[in-house]
Amino acid sequence: MEWDSGSDLSADDASSLADDEEGGLFPGGGPIPYPVGNLLHTAPCGFVVTDAVEPDQPIIYVNTVFEMVTGYRAEEVLGGNCRFLQCRGPFAKRRHPLVDSMVVSEIRKCIDEGIEFQGELLNFRKDGSPLMNRLRLTPIYGDDDTITHIIGIQFFIETDIDLGPVLGSSTKEKSIDGIYSALAAGERNVSRGMCGLFQLSDEVVSMKILSRLTPRDVASVSSVCRRLYVLTKNEDLWRRVCQNAWGSETTRVLETVPGAKRLGWGRLARELTTLEAAAWRKLSVGGSVEPSRCNFSACAVGNRVVLFGGEGVNMQPMNDTFVLDLNSDYPEWQHVKVSSPPPGRWGHTLTCVNGSNLVVFGGCGQQGLLNDVFVLNLDAKPPTWREISGLAPPLPRSWHSSCTLDGTKLIVSGGCADSGVLLSDTFLLDLSIEKPVWREIPAAWTPPSRLGHTLSVYGGRKILMFGGLAKSGPLKFRSSDVFTMDLSEEEPCWRCVTGSGMPGAGNPGGVAPPPRLDHVAVNLPGGRILIFGGSVAGLHSASQLYLLDPTEDKPTWRILNIPGRPPRFAWGHGTCVVGGTRAIVLGGQTGEEWMLSELHELSLASYLT
């Protein structure tokens, strides 16, 4: 994240800020919660900010003085913990034995208890030379009295300790005195360093600078000074930030969710970024879906859950449509009378395109596997299914995966063909044109054939494939592999992000989900993917949630511990995402898909619970 330091304030400006009783940086007014006086030494101070919300409290900002004194550039240390300064040089893996462990323990204690720390600790420059760090750590509290950031002010002092040469070091950094003398007078004065930014109008700062930052960065920038704090309280700015970071379609969907306006864009951005308000709850709804069935497909249209088809008694394919309106005070399943329904089927996909249009593809019918396409406008009067006769269709299949691109294009991948043959192809159908034509997406290399996997869209035109029942030679096995493809490229190709010995596969940090199929994949704002449920072997819990951000340089799996009552079972074909902020899991606690009067809801924002 990018921060702008307040450490260039002149003495008069700093005193004015510290004495202003109307507040400035933080809610409720009052003095600035970190010692401005410490920034006014004759010699400049290092200034470091860490994110107390994230695991291991990563560094999110260092000022120029820190870089010049320690020899570490900002890009080398951002995202890491400050403890690297206790190691002698960039190649050292352990804390140096001369570093006082009692002081380190006291620092940890103060951070854990949320209190300020003051003391001295031996640190090392990048070249391995020692210096004493007169350190002051101050916790910063958010609106809900939780610690959001920790500010560290560092006054570095030369120390005469002969430690000998540093292994792997080929150069010697300048001494601290030389660095201080090299600093121009203007660089020591914060107000001069920031005047270029503050000469801009509020409109330019908000619309041309702040709106282009990520939600995390905007939250960080708000702590720089009073003016930026006030600017970042504007709801229109936060909406623009969310739109730029998450896309217009996601923003539009979020606007339709009940309660979003009451929560506000600033709070919504925070909760959907940190997932701090995510919670499970169990719901009971009225109505019924008769006859009972399994292996149906569910999809969300706005705040409505739509269920189509399924496998009835004696493997009877179904072709009826049911709707559950979650906007209702008392939601209940209602049978929708539609004209010209498709042939009955199960193992198909049901996908939403163009707002209120539903697309059915494939599945297993009375006469075998299908590769037909039907579209239903749920808001039409009366609703009528119509068949789309796309040219050059894919092979008939079931238990494939599908997703939508740009709101108009259907993408179909894999599945099971005749005689149990697993497929590895990927097709695209543009439903916005009058006579759609199926187009296979060619790739020099494709992931192993599979069924029961998921496709997720992120970053505009990128798709991510996860899991499924994959084929390797004569063997079929549950998979936890991750593959991505960028469809904006001239020649799209599959890339293996993580995998079990796949070509070019990486080894992600964290704990990867156990291999599975027919699981749930939830697209989160910003490109992150949430995985849970499905068919998992062994004693692993299917209700455990796993988070992956494929946009990171080194994607890392993270386990999420969400409060509430999660379902013991969740199936991909029976789960849908409503409004971009709620995952609705159909079926009872014991996994019986036909118990559709019981739902489990994963809410990602507090206004939904």
From Swiss-Prot:
Residue span(s) of domain F-box: 195-241
Domain of life per record: Eukaryota
Localization (cell): Nucleus; Cytoplasm
Mutagenesis / variant outcome for changing L200A: No SCF(ADO1) complex formation and reduced cyclic degradation of ADO1, but no effect on binding to GI
Modified residues annotated as S-4a-FMN cysteine in this record: C82
Stimuli inducing this protein: Not regulated at the transcript level, but circadian-regulation at the protein level with a peak at the end of the subjective day.
Per-repeat ranges for Kelch: 292-342, 345-392, 397-445, 450-501, 516-564
Positions with biased composition (Low complexity): 1-17
Start and end residues of each PAS domain: 32-114
Outcome reported for the amino acid change (mutating G564R): In ztl-30; long-period phenotype, but no effect on binding to PHYB
Result when mutating D372N: In ztl-26; long-period phenotype, but no effect on binding to PHYB
GO terms for biological process, alphabetical: flower development; protein ubiquitination; rhythmic process
Effect of C82A: Loss of binding to GI, but no effect on FNM binding
Tissue: Ubiquitously expressed with higher levels in cotyledons and leaves.
Region called Disordered, residue ranges: 1-24
Presence of keyword tRNA processing: no
Outcome following mutation: P317S: In ztl-24; long-period phenotype, but no effect on binding to PHYB
Self-association state and partner proteins as the record states: Interacts with NFXL2. Interacts (via N-terminus) with GI and (via Kelch repeats) with ADO3. Component of an E3 ubiquitin ligase SCF(ADO1) complex composed of SKP1A/ASK1 (or SKP1B/ASK2), CUL1, RBX1 and ADO1. Also interacts with SKP1D/ASK4, SKP1K/ASK11, CRY1, PHYB, APRR1 and APRR5, and probably with SKP1N/ASK14 and SKP1S/ASK19.
Cited function: Component of an E3 ubiquitin ligase complex that plays a central role in blue light-dependent circadian cycles. Acts as a blue light photoreceptor, due to the presence of FMN, that mediates light-regulated protein degradation of critical clock components by targeting them to the proteasome complex. The SCF(ADO1) E3 ubiquitin ligase complex is involved in the regulation of circadian clock-dependent processes including the transition to flowering time, hypocotyl elongation, cotyledons and leaf movement rhythms.
Further remark: 'Zeitlupe' means slow motion in German.
Protein name (database record): Adagio protein 1
